[in-house]
Amino acid sequence: MLVWLAEYLTQFESAFNVFSYLTLRAILSVLTALVLSLWLGPTLIRRLQRLQIGQTVRDDGPESHLVKSGTPTMGGVLILAAVLGSSLLWADLDNRYVWVVLLVTTGFGIVGFVDDYRKVVRKDPKGLIAKWKYFWQSVIASVAAVYLYWSSTQGAETALLVPFFKDVMPQLGMLYMLMAYFVIVGTSNAVNLTDGLDGLAIMPTIMVAAALGIFAYVSGNVNFAEYLQIPYLPLTAELLVVCTAIVGAGLGFLWFNTYPALVFMGDVGSLALGAALGIIAILVRQELVLFIMGGVFVMETLSVMLQVGSYKLRGKRVFRMAPIHHHYELKGWPEPRVIVRFWILSLIFVLIGLATLKLR
């Protein structure tokens, strides 16, 4: 929004041209989102407490979690507000990729909001019925996938980039839509599964978003793209502003969500953030690298799949409890230890993902 204003004011004062610089707007985006989160956070938490919108704790979970009962949830509204507010201020709104990311993120956030609302306000333990949650996720992801496929203007936009290989870039054709669908829905639900401990999901999200911002910037810069031998995708550079907004909003939320948490993000936050990571990875053509960088999310998801599959097929559990972070809690690890060690793993996964830019 301010890009439009700056373009107009540049006619009268050339100094306003500074706001056309992408890196400056990215810095201002992260700072704006951070300030919005820190400013709005206390008010939101007090409002949630007043409305008694508190987390319900599973009876079969770790005993240490019983003290979390009643902690305000739906804090993901704070993240969404900061991301949307900062992105709308500092991103170039003529860029259609920006709108795709914001609309998908908002759509999944609404699905999560309805689920949270039914659970904590209407006291329905099931929340939004699983089939309806999956239906609306599928609708949003499918619309985005179809739009991106039919609006693509160059082959690189629908090709699969294989990490660590320079010249392996097969054209997906219509399979692109199927892959995009699974990446968006899968990443959204993976982040949702990870959000079980204080700060556990938000820090890996921050790291992955920052890394995706780097991928967006270099793939949207013709010189960097040529040097790194990756496809030049001119529309992706502007996604750096959205990625930094996610980083800023995430850091602001972590201020309140760090152990012991004052607020939880709820499905409104986890589903939205996961969808944002998924759609950005698709746009910058780094779906396979997302699988690497989001290694913690992958671990959490696979642990649930293994647990359910093993119990149905063999009548035995693989882990003491799934997702896997609860397994380590039941082994006696204090919650902060589980969280920080998973953060360290996430950092390692992200660094490996970034290394694919040169190790080709």
From Swiss-Prot:
Q: Name one GO molecular function term.
A: metal ion binding
Q: Which GO terms describe its cellular component?
A: plasma membrane
Keywords assigned by UniProt?
Cell cycle, Cell division, Cell inner membrane, Cell membrane, Cell shape, Cell wall biogenesis/degradation, Magnesium, Membrane, Metal-binding, Peptidoglycan synthesis, Transferase, Transmembrane, Transmembrane helix
Subcellular localization is given as:
Cell inner membrane
Q: In which pathway does it act?
A: Cell wall biogenesis; peptidoglycan biosynthesis
The Swiss-Prot or TrEMBL record lists the needed cofactor(s) as: Mg(2+)
Q: Which domain of life is it from?
A: Bacteria
Reactions that this protein is recorded to catalyse: UDP-N-acetyl-alpha-D-muramoyl-L-alanyl-gamma-D-glutamyl-meso-2,6-diaminopimeloyl-D-alanyl-D-alanine + di-trans,octa-cis-undecaprenyl phosphate = di-trans,octa-cis-undecaprenyl diphospho-N-acetyl-alpha-D-muramoyl-L-alanyl-D-glutamyl-meso-2,6-diaminopimeloyl-D-alanyl-D-alanine + UMP
Enumerate the Gene Ontology biological process terms.
Answer: cell division; cell wall organization; peptidoglycan biosynthetic process; regulation of cell shape
Which positions, given as ranges, span the membrane? 25-45, 73-93, 97-117, 128-148, 168-188, 199-219, 236-256, 262-282, 288-308, 338-358
Against InterPro entries, the record matches this protein to:
Glycosyl_transferase_4, PNAcMuramoyl-5peptid_Trfase, PNAcMuramoyl-5peptid_Trfase_CS
Describe the family membership recorded for this protein in Swiss-Prot or TrEMBL: Belongs to the glycosyltransferase 4 family. MraY subfamily.
Entry-linked PANTHER family: PHOSPHO-N-ACETYLMURAMOYL-PENTAPEPTIDE-TRANSFERASE, PHOSPHO-N-ACETYLMURAMOYL-PENTAPEPTIDE-TRANSFERASE HOMOLOG
NCBIfam families xrefs: mraY (TIGR00445)
What is the protein name stated in its UniProt record? Answer: Phospho-N-acetylmuramoyl-pentapeptide-transferase
Species of provenance: Idiomarina loihiensis (strain ATCC BAA-735 / DSM 15497 / L2-TR)
Gene name in the database record: mraY
